[in-house]
């Protein structure tokens, strides 16, 4: 088995870390839903199901004007290539097989903002 394939297989079977940023493949989508290969934040690892809840990131900084978004700066901790916006309103469940590698992790203040937005969104 090629080394890259083995590495991807091993990652999909390991424990994901919550509030870490990973590269994910969201495939193709319709409308305004984020797709393709992009960074995303794992907010909840559902390891017993081999799934996780993620928030996709976009490098389109104009997205900040939308509700339920958080700016994620390019820092040593996040290890992003450029400043990005977390699209909290587009959180979704994906199979762990769609995750290819760890990029970085969020700062505590960013985690707090995201948790507050999720609570506000789902206040039923």
Task: Label each region the model flagged.
Residues 27-31:
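Short, charged beta-turn/beta-strand-edge "cap" motif at the junction between a beta-strand
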Residues 1, 5, 9-14, 75-124:
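C-terminal terminal-subdomain/extension
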Residues 32-37, 42-75:
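Compact nucleic-acid interaction/catalytic patches
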Residues 18-19:
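Loop/turn positions that initiate beta-strands
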């Amino acid at each position: 088995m090629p080394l890259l394939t083995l590495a991807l297989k091993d990652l999909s079977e390991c424990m994901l870390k919550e509030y870490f940023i990973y590269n994910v493949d969201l495939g193709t989508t319709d409308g305004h839903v984020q797709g393709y290969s992009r960074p995303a934040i794992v907010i909840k690892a559902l390891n017993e199901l081999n799934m996780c809840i993620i928030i996709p990131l976009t490098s389109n900084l104009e997205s900040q004007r939308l509700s339920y978004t958080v700016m994620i700066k390019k820092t040593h901790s996040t290890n992003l290539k450029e400043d990005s916006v977390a699209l909290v309103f587009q959180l979704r469940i994906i199979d762990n097989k769609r995750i290819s590698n760890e990029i970085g992790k969020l700062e505590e203040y960013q985690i707090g903002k995201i948790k507050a937005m999720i609570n506000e969104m789902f206040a039923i």
